[in-house]
């Protein structure tokens, strides 16, 4: 029996790993990012730790910080519009599984416009094109969404979770920076650690 194993193009690990961002971006010729995160990470300064690196390197970006816990179809749809309006050619996802899942949904619909919305990608998705490149910077150690080919979105109309599986949505680069995780409240860090176990 033959099995297939899909991984990111490259992963960086260690305290301060976010400082590799300018090199990662320049080496790939990417021009403008849509930063996908949530208001809590903006409020507590965790996202700022990444944005400061982008600012210091004069990297263009716009922020979509409306990610909700357990993101919904409408949440992803708003992100798709933000990405198109920003004319971003790559995505930087900062956060836990919700930010990663939202970024995947945004990225795959933007590059596969024949699909009306994320609902049409439930199950094993039939996309043909790779999603916009995603650089994933996890702030939790729970779902490993920065390295997987699946994402979970809530369909509000049916009131159920959709699992989407698509090799085209795996983040191109994972940057696992312990300093981002240190910055979270201890209770959240502990809870996501238990989730990983």
Walk through the language-model features, giving the residues of each:
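Electropositive phosphate-/nucleotide-binding environments in soluble metabolic enzymes
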Residues: 12-19, 44, 48, 73, ...
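N-terminal small/polar loop signature for handling phosphorylated ligands or for N-terminal nucleophile
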Residues: 42-115
């Amino acid at each position: 029996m033959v099995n297939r194993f899909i991984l990111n193009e490259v992963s960086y690990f260690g305290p301060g790993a976010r400082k590799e961002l300018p090199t990662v971006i320049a080496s790939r010729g990417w021009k403008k990012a849509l930063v996908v995160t949530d208001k809590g990470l903006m409020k507590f300064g965790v996202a700022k730790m990444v944005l400061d690196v982008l600012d210091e390197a004069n990297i263009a970006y716009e922020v979509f910080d409306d990610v909700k816990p357990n993101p919904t179809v409408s949440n992803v749809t708003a992100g798709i519009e933000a990405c198109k309006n920003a004319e971003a050619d790559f995505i930087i996802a900062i956060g836990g599984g919700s930010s990663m899942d939202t970024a995947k949904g945004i990225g795959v619909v933007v590059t596969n416009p024949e699909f009306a919305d994320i609902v049409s990608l439930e199950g094993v998705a039939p996309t043909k094109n790779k999603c916009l490149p995603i650089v994933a910077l996890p702030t939790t150690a729970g779902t490993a969404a920065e390295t997987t080919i699946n994402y979970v979105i809530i369909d509000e109309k049916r009131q159920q979770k959709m699992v989407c599986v698509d090799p085209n949505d795996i983040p191109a680069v994972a940057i696992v920076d312990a300093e981002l995780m240190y910055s979270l409240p201890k209770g959240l860090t502990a809870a996501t650690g238990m989730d990983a176990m």
